[in-house]
């Protein structure tokens, strides 16, 4: 049976960046992989960022956004059926940052998918500098994704390092600085889990805290075998469109400096929420 890994994580946590590294490891190991991208918005930006991975060992597929839940579920299943005929060794699914993890497991139990696929690892990407102030809906998404994770991978630790030696030195310093922040994030996650009536408690052993530029074969092998943790929790009913929105800047000729200035003005403008 083909194993499917689910890579979850809140909006902007770093899922696509992680998938690039994970996919490269799998291809270097001789595996043929498929990557299924699903974006909440109508334009799949993440797929654009992965285009250069396409080749003999890697194919990209996408589920278009902007549809109702039932249509999305049907498209998800149809895409997995077609991918099941391509002879992949492993499939990576990157859902949107506001994905219901139960949908993944429910679909894999439907025919004919239950004869072709089995869940691999559920890997949840969490920003090591996660905001402390989050809405009820944001905390719910964070907790629901962490609840089923076989491994939680912290992102944005020791970024933009130049050499392996420098990476190792700065990684230690970065991890030392991040320990307090990560402890706070773990506490935040566990509080969010309690709020949705989930009995799971995330511990350090459930996490990978490391600069991604220094990830080893052993790290990736551990992630491949991380599996998942089936947990029960209380669902929060809310409409995605009423809580989260997508903004697009397509073919807009603007300098980096002007873009930064515009972004700062948006965040400082109370009318933007």
Give the residues covered by each predicted segment.
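Nucleotide-state-sensitive switch-loop elements of NTP-binding domains
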Residues: 2-135
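Short amphipathic alpha-helical segment that frequently serves as the phosphate-/nucleotide-binding helix
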Residues: 16-20, 139, 179, 260-263
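Short amphipathic alpha-helical segments and helix-helix/interface helices
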Residues: 23, 80, 94, 143, ...
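Short beta-strand/turn micro-motifs at beta-sheet edges
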Residues: 48, 139-142, 233-237
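Conserved phosphate/pyrophosphate-binding and hydrolysis machinery centered on Walker-type P-loop NTPases
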Residues: 98, 139, 249-253
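A short alpha->loop->secondary-structure connector
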Residues: 109-117, 142-146, 179
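Flexible active-site lid/hinge loop adjacent to a nucleotide/diphosphate
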Residues: 132, 136-148
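C-terminal accessory "lid"/substrate-recognition subdomains
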Residues: 148-273
